[in-house]
Amino acid sequence: MRKGIWQEFDGYQDVVAEIKVSRKLGGTASAAVIAAEEYIRKLHPARLALGVADIIEETASSKTLRLVSKDNYLPPFLAGQYIALFLEIGGIRTSRPYSISSQPNQVGYYDITIRRVENGLVSNYLLNEVKRGDSLSSSGPAGNFYFNPLIHKKKMVCIAGGSGITPFMSMIREIIECGLDRSVYLFYGSKTTDDVIFGNEIARLAQRFANIHYIPVIEEPAESYAGACGFITRNVLQKVLENIEDKSFFICGPQGLYDFCLPQVQDLGVPRRKIRQEMYGAPPNIHEYPGWPADIKPDDTFSVNVKNRKPIKAKAAESLLSALEKNEILVPSLCRSGECSMCRVKILSGKVYQPAGVPVRKSDRQFGYVHSCMAFPISDLEILL
């Protein structure tokens, strides 16, 4: 190669000038930059090394794992946020988000509460296999489902279903322990009284503190049950809430709860933009949702050609993210409910079904990106990770 040929490349002099500037500034700024980066990494770590300090049985189908740091530090969090556990189960590397149910004013541990899901890969593993002293890996705290004093009213209407109670438990505990000037109206839907998580604790707090209002709603009550029955309907809400103008609304639970309760809340006159939501995973019966192609059966199998990798098979009723994980193709993910956008992939050819309400950015729609956790193959696909 001819000596000095690189000097003839376009932009060579600009690169040389940039290097000189970087060397000049780098020496004086490096210490401050390094310190700032270390502090940021401490507050927002990519991974946390955690140990299981205790396991608390909440109901016959749910337990709380008390997690402590193996590095003697846990990042702060806001009541309502979650961590994602990174796991390998049966050779499948996957992740699951779990809301932190402990209060944020203590920094010694994170409590996460797991409810058993029928045929659930992760929930059954955590409930059946994990023991005190075991090690787990997680993300740092994440999520936008929290109280913001700049935009939210001091009176909170919280609608929960199943394990969707966990972020509200963190909020309630913080309000009580820190003496915050907020009120909570908690409507908690469960199939039976035996399925209610934290029921005794919430009932005690509601009896003791005037700013905590607890309304359990039981779908299949026992004969002796005297509370609200059925589902969390507009009528159930109206019986408790005098008006809506001075309240903020939060919904957390499975997709079915959100699909049912959102119209009930809107019927009260609450604008959609004033209702915060936190969904737990993809719908279990996605083929029953509006817009699902009538000619596609849940067990229909399609070929997914992952660019620069071998093709895989994916069932229509299984999210693209789950199919990739089962075939040992790891895709970054946190929320698994279509909100964080970390698992986005580009559809090069083929079609996927996405349920209404998934917050896909306009630019992603324009260039063919989807959230793989909430995208279901309805034809053969070619994708780019």
Annotate each PLM feature.
Residues M1-Q7, G11-D14, N124-N305:
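FNR/FR-type flavoprotein reductase catalytic core
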Residues E325, I329-Y353, D364-I378:
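Local cysteine-cluster metal-coordination motifs and their immediate loop/turn environment
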Residues G80-Q81, D295-F302, E339-S341, P377:
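A short, compositionally biased
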Residues I34-S135, S139, K153-K154, S190-T192, ...:
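Ferredoxin-reductase
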Residues E177-Y185, G350-P359:
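Phosphate-handling active-site elements
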Residues M1-H44, D267, R272, I378, ...:
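Iron-sulfur (Fe-S) cluster-binding modules
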Residues P298-P332, R336-E339, L348:
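C-terminal accessory/binding modules appended to enzymatic or scaffolding proteins
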